Amino acid sequence: MKLILTADVDNLGAPGDTVEVKDGYGRNYLLPRGLAIVATRGAEKQVEGIRRAQEARAVRGLDHAKELKAAIEGLESVTLTVKTAGGSGKLFGSVTVADVAAAIKAAGGPIVDKRSIVLPKAHIKNTGKHAVVVNLHPDVVAKFNLNVVGA
């Protein structure tokens, strides 16, 4: 039985792949669970159109990620003011990725998804300069220094 996968199936393929499987596996497992559709000429043309659209979207996503990288790395200084506990430079609490995303926006940078920000440790717990990485795309990574200042 010839099928087109609509979801990632272990040991079989990725969405959009045309696979040849035994009739029982296709009829009793893949089709009822919505993991595949029967391969017809119309379905193959539709999958090809979707694949071309995804490739075009990926190229646009890469261009957009490069623009965001230039904007983030072009920021002169990203400063975050936080309460400190005493004069030792330790913070009262910690700086999270959401705080860093807000600091980038406040510094005049683009809006960045907090899930794409990678801190040197899980949380920043002291004042000073910290290297922060932003994963914008699998091929594009922006790096900048975050200056944490006590209030």
UniProtKB/Swiss-Prot annotation:
GO terms for molecular function: rRNA binding; structural constituent of ribosome. It holds the Pfam family Ribosomal_L9_C. Binds to the 23S rRNA. Belongs to the bacterial ribosomal protein bL9 family. This is Large ribosomal subunit protein bL9. One of its GO terms (cellular component) is ribosome. HAMAP family: Ribosomal_bL9. It comes from the Bacteria. The keyword tRNA-binding does not apply. One of its GO terms (biological process) is translation. Keywords: Ribonucleoprotein, Ribosomal protein, RNA-binding, rRNA-binding.
